[in-house]
Amino acid sequence: MDRRTAAGIPLIVVSAAGYATGSVLAAPIYATGVDWLTLVQWRFLVGATLGWIWVLVSSERRASLVRMPRRALLVALALGALFTGNAGTYYAGLETVPAALAGVLVYTYPVIVAVLSLRFATRLPGRRPWIALGLAVAGSALALGGIDVATAPPIEGLLLVWASALIYSVWIILSARLSGERRDRLGSDAPEAAQPVGDAAVTTAVMMSATASVYAVAGLAVGRPLDPARIPAEAWPLLAGVVLVASFLAIQTFYAGARRIGAARAALISTVEPPIIVVLSFVFLGQTLAPIQLAGAALILIAVIVAQTSPRPKGAPEPATPLEAEV
């Protein structure tokens, strides 16, 4: 193992742990009286602010902002606005679904992406997408089958978590298409437009700003404007944890790790996120999964690995990862 790989792998693990922290912190935040809309409003507002500070303190990133093509800017704004559906459904689901179970179910998204790619994007060869889908469905069935009926979360919450996975999968397909990937380019060199545009930190800051703006408008529309006075004092440290650890730290460590080991390997290593959520949920929230649910989680992870390790045709993009979005 070379030095870059040795440094990159721990960074991706730290990133996965950071993202997992956001799921686990949601429950104690909700316990203070803060609901999902308020949580995501502040998460993306403060996250976008930190993102712009990170851009502006670096002359290289400032230069990338100035050079950012207009099309890339519009794409980032559009994707940021669309991302509200994924984040909103997931955190709304976490109001009633335990973080451990939600973390397992939502991680079916790489498999959904692989299947959707058969029709809407650069398809993966062979039967792997269908094998992965079968494993993911079986894993989800086991995860749900092990739920204690006496303490089962409402079906609405489970549907919200699944909706989050589906919306994020569609979002990834759209992001690839808007960035220039063409389904009819299969087997040929990737078009120039599909290459990374601008600095990743700049793109993320723009996207998070768009997401924050949509949530701010949504809050005004339902009579819930951003008002710090409405946040209980005990919720602020937890909100800070979501912003600093689950957003800023997770994003930056993923970028740093992916630059060292590549997005494909980073995507594979990121599959440690659901197990981390399960462990953190047990340690800090006392949440546990039944043995049959753990078996289901294992099947889902195997499905993700099958989808992520499928050989890609020449010119096909690397597997979708959190590099393309703030999650």
Model-predicted regions and their roles:
Residues 50-55, 109-134, 275-295:
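C-terminal transmembrane-helix exit sites in multi-pass transporters
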